[in-house]
């Protein structure tokens, strides 16, 4: 069957082999559609050859003065299509058949292959922190009653007032929590009085005839007990300590040195030392026992365990800053305040410090970077001076026990710091609040559902006929979405639906797709690929 189209183009004969059979017989290929390029698989080696057959007419699209009027599809810009000259068979423009734009206005796009759709759908991932914050905000928004419910129930304004108060309270608690977190990072200490008790006892020597037994027997006197000896005890406790947990005495010190009289005990046995180690067990006191029956002068050197560590400044820098012993951070702050007060920072190069005559004597330079100050300051810091206590160990038999008391200032952790840590770590109230929030969300959701049901029934009671028609239209739309129905069956069953301008292009696309399908089948059967 052959003939001519509406635009005067010859229609090729249709055979079961389609375009592939026509190409095998040497017939010219079907011309391309308006505004479409010929299929590259059908083009020959020549610039305008078709199927590689000599004498094939080159493709020439018709101009605007063609016999048929130009048709512009809805939604397309002018000039995007060539004039349509009747029914023509050719490769469609744009994407391949099945994935192109809708064939007619109002028709939804073709459904995507489920396998390809599955590849394009991103895999489920755990929510990011920003998404979790969004969920939290949505939860807060879910607690708000809609305006239509507030208008319907005036008493709900009391609930909205409570919700606004809760929001302000949450903001205040969050701000205080952040302030507590910042405060815990800084050392919170209090100065307390530590009372040190230094006491000694004396045990006189015993004669050989004091006991009926002999040394080494159960009734005798050991040889060590025959020699006079004294015992020195160093203990202490905090005064007015409100904490219930008693702190060990050794925990206040980094080291303890007891220096005895060198003339009595010699250069190798006159020092008793204790230094803190990582494995040190805390104790309530120290005890030293030595033989002797003479009064002994001793010196106690106590090195406090400062947390954070403190340092003693060079005398020149201490006089300049007015700081004797402080932490490194406090020393740096005092140094910066001195630089700022005396305007020693360079006006143009802000990272430099112009040294005055005092700084030149201390740092031995006329100018230095601010980043160099910690390195130069390290050579000017020393360990703090120990606490020195002079004590006399008495061996007077009439005074069996002598006790001396000394009060020193120590820094202990502020009890408020433990309370703040417990407040931040406490989750009891949070769990209770979370459970109440869940109940509120469920109640609000139930109220919204009841409001929807009320609106449904109210609309039905007001206009039953209009309501049922609108409801049926809505149900029909939902049914089409659920069942993936494409098109409009009510319009497609009428003949006028197929007399619209898009029908010609749709038929051309359909015929071209069939020709391509038959061509592929023929190539598969023959085992060759025609070019």
From Swiss-Prot:
All copies of domain SWIB/MDM2, residue ranges: 306-383
Phosphoserine modified-residue sites: 203
InterPro entries named among the record's database cross-references: SMARCD2_SWIB_dom (IPR030090), SWIB_domain (IPR019835), SWIB_MDM2_dom_sf (IPR036885), SWIB_MDM2_domain (IPR003121)
Sequence positions bearing Asymmetric dimethylarginine: 81, 104
Composition bias type Low complexity, residue spans: 34-45
Source species, domain of life: Eukaryota
Main location: nucleus
Compartments, record wording: Nucleus
Phosphothreonine: residues bearing it: 217
GO function term, MF aspect, one: transcription coregulator activity
Database matches in PROSITE patterns: SWIB_MDM2 (PS51925)
Cross-link Glycyl lysine isopeptide (Lys-Gly) (interchain with G-Cter in SUMO2) mapped to chain: 226
Gene Ontology, cellular component aspect: nucleoplasm; nucleus; SWI/SNF complex
UniProt region (Disordered), positions on chain: 20-85, 202-226
Leader sequence residues: none
PTM statement from Swiss-Prot or TrEMBL: Ubiquitinated through a signaling process involving RAC1 and the RING finger protein UNKL.
Protein family membership: Belongs to the SMARCD family.
Protein name, UniProt field: SWI/SNF-related matrix-associated actin-dependent regulator of chromatin subfamily D member 2
Lineage of source species: Eukaryota, Metazoa, Chordata, Craniata, Vertebrata
Name of encoding gene: Smarcd2
